[in-house]
Every structure is written in C-alpha cells, then in structure tokens.
Amino acid sequence: LISSLEAVRTGAVSVRLHPLVILKDSLLAQEFVRGLFSPPGLEESLEILWKMYLIINGAGVDVNRIGVCLYGNEIKNVVAGPYHPALGELVRNRLMLEVLREHHRLGGSDHIALDKSHKGDFTGHRRYVIVTASNEGIIVQFRENGLRLDVESYLNSIRERLLGGIYAQT
C-alpha cells in the first residue's frame, strides 16, 4: 500500500497497477521452477489491489489499467502469478463487495433491496459480488425504486477506517 500512498503524495496524475506475473524464460521463472520464489496468488493480490485502487482513486488519481495486458498466445507465457483477463473488473467487484460489507457493518439490514441502477456495479463478474455477499449472510436484490447507496460515502468510510488519519493528510 505504500506505493499507492507515494503515488498520491508525489502528485501522480495516472497510474497502472500491475501485480507480479511471471513469464516464461525470465529470471523469475527460473527461480520459481527451482522453488526459490513464488508470487502471490489471485486472491492475495486482489486483497492488496482493491485497497490500492481505493487509495489512489479516492485521491483523484486516474487508474488507467489494472493487470498486465496479454493477447492471443502471449497468455501461454504466464508461468505463475495473478494473471486474469478481467483483473480490473475483479478489483472493482471486490471494492463493491466492501461497500456492501461497510453498509452492513454500519447497521444496514441483512437483506438489501438496491435500486436497479446499482445492478451492474453490485452483481459483478460471474455474479461474484452478490454470491459472496450471500455467502456472508448479506442478501442483495434489485428492484425499481430500491435503495440508492451513496457509494462514495461508503468508500470514504472504508478509506478512513483502512488508513485512519494518514489518508486525510495525503
């Protein structure tokens, strides 16, 4: 997370978030094969990336890519690491899951009937957000004239809880 705070502190206008992906024929690939090095997996990387995105985006810095972009046969060169073709979407999905968790933590109901306008944000890639929330006891439905969450307010609350007074100074 330190690099996120540094990007904000130094006045970056835009950033790219690239977790370590090991490619064939690299020095890291050799170390990986020998068991000397292992990159974080997808879940561990998502746990870091959503927080980085929250910090950077919340400071008004544009995040213009998340994850390495590989095309066609280049994907076959991935040896290890958190490569996913929709990594940016997964990070934003995780952030929306955190919004639901924050809503619940702050006294929201176990059953949330969100306005249909939230459906795209709170469904997620392969229904990740609503399925994970449901597994945690937070049931999400969508309907006309449903609850309209102030997402930015929840993101600010998460930022403050995550970083305390540090974030307020960036």
Task: Name each model feature, range by range.
Residues 8-11, 108:
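Short loop/turn motifs at secondary-structure junctions
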Residues 27, 34-170:
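Auxiliary Fe-S-binding modules of radical SAM enzymes
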Residues 12-25:
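Non-cysteine beta-strand/loop elements that form the S-adenosyl-L-methionine
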Residues 1-9:
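Catalytic cores of alpha/beta
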Residues 1, 29-32:
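Short, glycine/charged-enriched secondary-structure capping and boundary segments
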